[in-house]
């Protein structure tokens, strides 16, 4: 999956984006919809996963995004969606949108420096601006798009006694394998069978496995919805836009993870743009930080936080014990280093703090911002090469380089590792061409034939034994917050 993410990141770079994804959305500016005002949704990755509490506005973002394209001129059976389809005004909801509401769509063009900008705004009771939108097939996979046939009682159910089979649509073997990998069952075959009853026509999915076959009428909701969704993603035109509402519904955790992998794969192959709302920590953790958005709503309005998910915040808020101070760091290495440095200097404060590995510098900054808005006392300790910003409660590790480089670059640490494991750190990093400091411990552990956490802990202990006052200022600043 890492290689797929790397390929997608390269394809989606600003200079290469249009050639791969066409006139996809770069940004959507939302103003005046369901309490969302002056908000920018930036789409920094082909797959964007929006998390947040119920009622925060996740669905609103997707609904407005899918209204960003007009019907392709070559499509006959395709129907586009408009803002009015999602924001009905009635006695029950007289003002879901403001009188001056508008949405500004920013599309990629062949000149990456100049995005196409189209504003959709209210002109009296109607909406103007749709005609200037680019063309694209868009698909909204909400909860009512796929309802099990046994529940909606379509003609495959009420006309079952006199059904006639019409044309059968075959599904490619590779697509069947992808569905099987997600669900966790091996399928012998999956097809869509055309059916007819009293001049009415429809289509029903039929799966074969373990020596017998069954139709959608006997499928569970999760299995049927996956079949429907994958079929759409694989058979629609390339470079389509998909909005998926909580795709994890009725899927077990392994299926959620495999589905997230599949979304990355299909975007890499078919260059779709996908925006999904989700509460699934499995899906969110399977996607890169650039794909994650957290939306929050309070008395001051609605905000979007980048590279962080609701799961990060939820895990802190529901950790099962109350600490006086939450400290956000970038990764596990930073968490262990800070924990052990505090233990060596003032171990008593460990009982008053909780340290959380969040993500990169942007995710850490956003996490602190969100936590402080919830009333939690929170700070960050960022890598030394990023620096500190005391005003925004962002402290920094000592030194001038990332913690991994400071630790493994220490002469005493290098000598200790060579003595115990017979490894020359400089040579290993040169031989393996390690440019990412997050990979240093992994490569050393591989050469030493041991686990990464063993090397990590050993190096940090040797490092802290050698240094003297380097962490004093940082720990003093942490104590100020207690």
Listing of model-derived features with the role each one plays in the protein:
Residues 2-20, 143-219, 231:
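Extended helical coiled-coil dimerization/tether regions that scaffold
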Residues 137, 240-241, 325, 378:
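The start of beta-strands in P-loop NTPase/AAA+ ATPase cores
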Residues 50, 56, 427-482:
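C-terminal, charge/polar-rich interaction regions
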Residues 58, 383-449:
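Activity-critical C-terminal alpha-helical subdomain
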Residues 2, 12-13, 285-392, 402:
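RecA-like P-loop NTPase motor core
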Residues 1-151:
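P-loop NTPase switch/coupling surface
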Residues 2-14, 19-69, 213-317:
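Switch/communication elements of ASCE P-loop NTPase nucleotide-binding domains
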Residues 48-50, 139-141, 275, 293, ...:
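Hydrophobic/aromatic beta-strand patches that form the interior of the parallel beta-sheet core
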């Amino acid at each position: 999956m890492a290689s797929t993410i790397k390929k997608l990141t390269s394809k989606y770079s600003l200079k290469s984006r249009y050639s791969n994804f066409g006139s996809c959305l770069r940004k959507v500016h939302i103003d005046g919809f369901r309490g969302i005002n002056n908000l920018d949704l930036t789409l920094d990755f082909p797959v964007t996963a929006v998390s947040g509490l119920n009622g925060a506005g996740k669905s609103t973002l997707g609904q407005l995004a899918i209204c960003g394209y007009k019907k392709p001129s070559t499509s006959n059976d395709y129907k586009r969606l408009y803002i009015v389809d999602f924001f009905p005004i009635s006695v029950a909801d007289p003002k879901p949108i403001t009188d001056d509401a508008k949405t500004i769509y920013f599309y990629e063009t062949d000149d990456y420096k100049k995005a196409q900008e189209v504003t959709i705004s209210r002109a009296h009771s109607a909406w103007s601006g749709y005609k200037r939108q680019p063309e694209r097939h868009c698909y909204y996979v909400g909860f009512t798009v796929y309802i099990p046939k046994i529940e909606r009682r379509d003609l495959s159910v009420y006309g079952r006694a006199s059904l006639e089979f019409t044309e059968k649509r075959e599904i490619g073997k590779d697509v069947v394998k992808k569905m099987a990998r997600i669900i966790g069952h091996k399928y012998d075959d999956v097809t869509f069978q055309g059916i007819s009853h009293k001049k009415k026509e429809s289509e029903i999915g039929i799966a074969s496995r373990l020596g017998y076959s069954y139709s959608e009428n006997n499928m569970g909701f999760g299995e049927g919805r996956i079949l429907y969704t994958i079929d759409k993603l694989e058979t629609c035109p390339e470079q389509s836009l998909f909005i998926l509402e909580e795709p994890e519904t009725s899927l077990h955790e392994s299926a959620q993870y495999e589905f997230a992998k599949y979304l990355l794969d299909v975007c890499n192959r078919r260059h779709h743009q996908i925006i999904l709302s989700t509460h699934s920590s499995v899906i969110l953790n399977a996607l890169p930080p650039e794909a994650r958005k957290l939306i929050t709503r309070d008395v001051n309005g609605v905000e979007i936080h980048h590279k962080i998910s609701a799961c990060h915040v939820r895990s802190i808020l529901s950790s099962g014990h109350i600490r006086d101070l939450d400290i956000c760091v970038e990764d596990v290495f930073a968490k262990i280093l800070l924990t052990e440095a505090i233990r060596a200097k003032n171990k008593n404060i460990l009982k008053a703090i909780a340290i959380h590995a969040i993500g990169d510098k942007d995710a850490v900054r956003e996490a602190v911002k969100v936590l402080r808005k919830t009333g939690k006392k929170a700070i960050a300790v960022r890598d030394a090469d990023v620096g500190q910003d005391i005003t925004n409660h962002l402290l920094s590790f000592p030194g001038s380089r990332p913690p991994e480089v400071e630790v493994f670059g220490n002469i005493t640490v290098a000598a200790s590792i060579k003595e115990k494991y017979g490894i020359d750190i400089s040579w290993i990093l040169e031989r393996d061409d390690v440019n990412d400091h997050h990979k240093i411990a992994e490569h050393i552990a591989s050469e030493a034939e041991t686990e990464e956490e063993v090397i990590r802990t050993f190096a940090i202990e040797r490092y802290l034994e050698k240094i003297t006052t380097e962490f004093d200022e940082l720990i003093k600043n942490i104590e100020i917050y207690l």
